[in-house]
């Protein structure tokens, strides 16, 4: 008889709910384990089969750690602000709150039906005012620390939609919705000074148990480089000014034959000569239609225009042309570069296209053919001639410093974090702009600053957020002075709520502080964080930044939030393609839970292959996982639902070795998240159980304990069939006996005149004499030596007996 998954799974989910089986108590003295999932955005589509892969992995570890006596924190919540809900509201006229609430209910039902052991009393929702009160509070701390400031930043402005779009909503210079033209337009924006923490964010990666590939992604994103800042005087009687550039190769300055500024550079308009004004203006307009990604595409043809202006090379004294080109971004470095075409591929391409001088300053290449980017001695470089790269860099910086034209500098690719969004569905930024030009943050005791309800969620038309349309929200008067003010109408990005949610789980109902310091001390850092690699840079970098600020403020006790991080792989469609609605190959977990059961889905997703691999979904594999659970059930349970008589309380030793091997292997594999090989070993054990007449009850109990973290519903049901009234959740994890990992018996071969005549199992410690006796009394051997004289018997302990007979 196969087990009825619908009945059993519902029964145990109700039991866990009613008994609050997974409620976490803050036993501050107990050893702890904090297992965290990247909380989902509750979309209208609900859960897909990719979600449970990571969730099952953390759930197995959480259940395993509880059985090992740990105080486990395993929570779940909702990253519920964001664009899709706002888009839905714009399209339907419905409130995004309703949409979000409905989606959360669906997600929660689906997650509960998969049997995850979350403590639902700790659920958080980033759109709950009691939650975003503390998101706003953190913003105020950032502001007070000088880490939040207002700046003019170029944004994607779409006049037809009357709104600012994120980079993801712009495709080839037009809006994703409606295909309207999009322009880059400077607007006042809130920016967070993440660059202040660049060195710490870089250095502390070394202490984290994260995949090296992921650490490298963060290192590259931060992009620390050492070099020099160099000033070129503009050679123009009317326009005073200096062009500042950052270069990692100040030693090549004698080869700098032109400068390139970004089209948005502050100097462009003042230095451009009348003759070139029209061309420059037209080029700036074209550049404003392109995203940064398009502008820096290495494959695209280089474009640019001459400004008519010149600068003076501070070391050679030569005049060099000043150009503008869209491949130089105003947001990177100083927004200007010194071009050394002889030794840089991009500059070489540009110089060739516009017939600009190419001056060789490092020997070893042929600059007629291509840029030379290798090592070599300096030439045509004044005092640097004859020096190799490193020595020349040091000398060049020295010369620049003497002339007051440069200095040694560290640069970062990392930009400050653009923090405001021109959206309605986000956390209001708690700032008031007063009519006298000052601004203040909302007093902390007045938090949360509530997001006003409105049925008019439409773009403001000015580029401000829809909040700008709500006068009752925007306009304020200072009670003490009578001064009028306007509230900030930008809202925070979706990243804000996810920067610190792992802290709120620790103390989710605290009304007086972000979280109790004693509880933070107990639970931090997160011991295991599992999620998709798509969050490798932004979410993880932003969360680390906020955590470091909170550490400096004395609020959190650790420098880093997440000690161990693991990225699960992607589950692909049956044809190895990414699952997507358009391809029609998305698999809904609800259907699988109905047809095969949640335990089967969990087991299958862990058995597909290594947790970090991308693997194609297979219906056959799913069926195979179900068959294994049916085999386990049939081994233990009779047709009438009673426990099989095959399970006995005496040990005939037949399963000693395989049981102890299984406990050892599963324990070791769980520690390394090697769930696929742990499951293989559980299958080996069940196969051995089918080969014997009796199964020792403590061994099958140990097996059920090892199966339960993976397949918890059938685990609980079998545990109760074994005569236990309490849940399996807090039962002690099985242990193994080293001595029983090896056999007490060995198989020996018996040869007569060099020919194999028998294989016999004997005790390991059998003496040579006993081996000879056993061999000679074997029926096959007797038949082979009948009528012959035994000349010699050689016994090799634990191996063989060789009989020579004539």
Swiss-Prot record:
GO molecular function: aminoacyl-tRNA deacylase activity; ATP binding; leucine-tRNA ligase activity
Coiled-coil ranges per UniProt: none
PANTHER family according to UniProt: LEUCINE--TRNA LIGASE, MITOCHONDRIAL, LEUCYL-TRNA SYNTHETASE
Keyword Aminoacyl-tRNA synthetase set for record: yes
Gene name in the database record: leuS
Annotated organism of origin: Staphylococcus aureus (strain MSSA476)
One GO biological process term: leucyl-tRNA aminoacylation
Motif 'KMSKS' region: chain residues: 578-582
EC nos: 6.1.1.4
Chain ranges for the short sequence motif 'HIGH' region as given in the UniProt record: 40-51
Official protein name in the record: Leucine--tRNA ligase
């Amino acid at each position: 008889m196969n087990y009825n998954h619908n009945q059993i799974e519902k029964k145990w989910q109700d039991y866990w709910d009613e008994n609050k089986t997974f409620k976490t108590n803050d036993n501050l003295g107990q050893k702890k384990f904090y297992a965290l999932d990247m909380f989902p955005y509750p979309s209208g589509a609900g859960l897909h089969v990719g979600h449970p892969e990571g969730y099952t992995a953390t759930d197995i570890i959480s259940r395993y750690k509880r059985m090992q006596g740990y105080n486990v924190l395993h929570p779940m919540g909702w990253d519920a602000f964001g664009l899709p809900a706002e888009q839905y509201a714009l399209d339907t006229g419905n409130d995004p709150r309703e949409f979000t609430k409905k989606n959360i209910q669906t997600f929660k039902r689906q997650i509960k039906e998969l049997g995850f052991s979350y403590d639902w009393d700790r659920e958080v929702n980033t759109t709950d005012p009691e939650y975003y009160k503390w998101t706003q509070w953190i913003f105020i701390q950032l502001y007070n620390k000088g880490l939040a400031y207002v700046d003019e930043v170029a944004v994607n402005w779409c006049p037809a939609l009357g709104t600012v779009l994120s980079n993801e909503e712009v495709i080839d210079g037009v809006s994703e919705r409606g295909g309207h033209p999009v322009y880059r337009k400077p607007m006042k924006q809130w920016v967070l000074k993440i660059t202040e923490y660049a060195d710490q964010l870089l250095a502390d990666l070394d202490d984290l148990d994260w995949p090296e590939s992921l650490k490298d992604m963060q290192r590259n994103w931060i992009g620390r480089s050492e070099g020099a800042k160099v000033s070129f005087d503009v050679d123009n009687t009317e326009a005073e000014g200096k062009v500042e550039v950052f270069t990692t190769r100040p030693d090549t300055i004698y080869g700098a034959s032109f400068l390139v500024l970004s089209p948005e550079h502050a100097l462009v308009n003042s230095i451009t000569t009348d003759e070139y004004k029209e061309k420059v203006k037209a080029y700036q307009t074209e550049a404003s239609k392109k995203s940064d990604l398009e502008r820096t595409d290495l494959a695209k043809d280089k474009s640019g225009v001459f400004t008519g202006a010149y600068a003076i090379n501070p070391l050679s004294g030569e005049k060099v042309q000043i150009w503008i080109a869209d491949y130089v971004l105003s947001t990177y470095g100083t927004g200007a570069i010194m071009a050394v075409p002889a030794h840089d591929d991009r500059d070489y391409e540009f110089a060739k296209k516009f017939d600009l001088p190419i001056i060789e300053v490092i020997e070893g290449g042929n600059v007629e053919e291509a840029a030379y980017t290798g090592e070599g001695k300096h030439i045509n470089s004044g005092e640097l001639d004859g020096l190799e790269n490193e020595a020349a860099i040091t000398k060049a910086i020295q010369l620049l410093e003497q002339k007051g034209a440069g200095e040694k500098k560290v640069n970062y690719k990392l930009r400050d974090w653009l923090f405001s969004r021109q959206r309605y569905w986000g956390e209001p930024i708690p700032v008031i702009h007063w009519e006298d030009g000052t601004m203040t943050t909302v007093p902390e005791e007045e938090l949360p600053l509530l997001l006003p309800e409105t049925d008019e969620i439409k773009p403001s038309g000015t580029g401000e957020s829809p909040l700008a349309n709500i006068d009752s929200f925007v306009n304020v008067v200072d009670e003490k002075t009578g001064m009028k003010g306007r509230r900030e109408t930008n809202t925070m990005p979706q990243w804000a709520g996810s920067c610190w949610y792992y802290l709120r789980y620790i103390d989710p109902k605290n009304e007086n502080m972000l979280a109790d310091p004693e509880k933070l001390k107990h639970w931090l850092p997160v011991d295991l964080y599992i999620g998709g690699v798509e969050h490798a840079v932004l979410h993880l970098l932003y969360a680390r930044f906020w955590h470091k600020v909170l550490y400096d403020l004395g609020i959190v006790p650790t420098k880093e939030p997440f000690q161990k991080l693991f990225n699960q792989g992607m589950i692909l469609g049956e044809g190895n393609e990414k699952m997507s609605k358009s391809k029609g190959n998305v698999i809904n977990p609800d259907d699988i839970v109905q047809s095969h059961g949640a335990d089967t889905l969990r087991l299958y997703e862990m058995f597909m292959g290594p947790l970090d691999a991308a693997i194609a979904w297979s219906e056959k594999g799913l069926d195979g996982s179900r068959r294994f659970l049916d085999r386990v059930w049939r081994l233990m349970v009779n047709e009438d639902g009673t426990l099989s008589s095959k399970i006995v309380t005496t040990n005939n030793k037949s399963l000693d070795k395989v049981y102890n091997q299984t406990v050892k292997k599963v324990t070791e594999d769980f520690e390394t998240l090697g769930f696929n090989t742990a499951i293989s070993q559980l299958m080996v054990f069940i196969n051995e159980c089918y080969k014997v007449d009796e199964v020792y009850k403590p061994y099958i109990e140990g097996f059920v304990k090892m199966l339960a973290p993976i397949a918890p519903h059938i685990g609980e049901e079998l545990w109760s069939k074994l005569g236990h009234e309490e849940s399996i959740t807090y039962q002690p994890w099985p242990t193994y006996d080293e001595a029983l990992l090896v056999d007490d018996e060995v198989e020996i071969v018996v040869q007569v005149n060099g020919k194999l005549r028998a294989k016999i199992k004997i005790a390991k410690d059998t003496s040579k004499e006993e081996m000879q006796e056993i061999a000679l009394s074997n029926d096959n051997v007797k038949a082979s030596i009948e009528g012959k004289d035994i000349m010699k018997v050689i016994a090799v302990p634990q191996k063989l007996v060789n009989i020579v007979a004539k």
